[in-house]
C-alpha cells in the first residue's frame, strides 16, 4: 500500500510541477511573451555597458564602437526590448546598475531613432519620463508618432519579434523533461522497493 501512495505523490508532484512552471511563464509580472527573447537581444548590446552603467567599468564619455550598430539592430528587430533595458530589471538580475539618464541619451548619441519610452507602459513596463539632457547636446531621438493610440501594443515594434507570440518559449519542454525523468524513477522505485 505504501508503494501506491509514493507513486501517487510522485505523479501529483510531477503534474503540479508542469502546471506551476506553465503558470510562471504566463504570469503578468514576467512581462510580455517576447521578454525571454529580449535577454539574448540585450546581450548583443554589451558594447553599450561602458556608457550606460554606473560603477566599475561604467561611466564612459561615449559608447564603444559596437554599441550604436547594436542599438540600431535592436530598434529594428525588437524595439520593445528597449523597455527592459530602460526599466533596469534585466540588468539588475545580472547585477548591473543602469544610469537611466545616460541610457535615455544613448539614441541621441548614436543617432538612432527610437520609439518614445513612455510607450513602454503599454507593455506594463514603466520606465519613467525622459530626463533633461546634459551639456553633451545630444537629445533623445524619439519618434513620438511611431505609435498612434489606435494601435495595439503589438504594433510597437514592426520587426519580426513583435509578432512572434507563438515563438515565445514555453514550459512544455521543461515539463516533458521532468515527466520523462520522474515517471521512470517512480516506476523503478515501485518495482525495486
Swiss-Prot record:
Record protein name field: Non-specific lipid transfer protein GPI-anchored 2
Residues linked to a lipid group, GPI-anchor amidated glycine type: 165
Cysteine disulfide partners in this protein: 38-83, 48-67, 68-110, 81-120
Domain of life (superkingdom): Eukaryota
A GO biological process held by the record: lipid transport
GO cellular component: plasma membrane; side of membrane
Main localisation: membrane
Tissue-by-tissue expression: Up-regulated in the epidermis of top stems. Expressed in roots, cotyledons, seedlings, leaves, stems, buds, flower and silique walls. Preferentially expressed in the shoot apical meristem and the root meristem. Also detected in expanding leaves and petals, developing flowers, and elongating pistils, stamens and siliques.
Assigned protein family: Belongs to the plant LTP family.
Residues that make up the propeptide removed upon maturation: 166-193
Modification(s) after translation: O-glycosylated on hydroxyprolines; noncontiguous hydroxylproline residues are glycosylated with arabinogalactan.
Function statement: Lipid transfer protein that, together with LTPG1, binds to lipids and functions as a component of the cuticular lipid export machinery that performs extensive export of intracellular lipids (e.g. C29 alkane) from epidermal cells to the surface to build the cuticular wax layer and silique walls. Contributes to pre-invasive defense against some non-host powdery mildew pathogens by preventing the penetration of the epidermal cell wall by the fungal agents (e.g. Blumeria graminis f. sp. hordei (Bgh)).
Membrane topology: Lipid-anchor; GPI-anchor
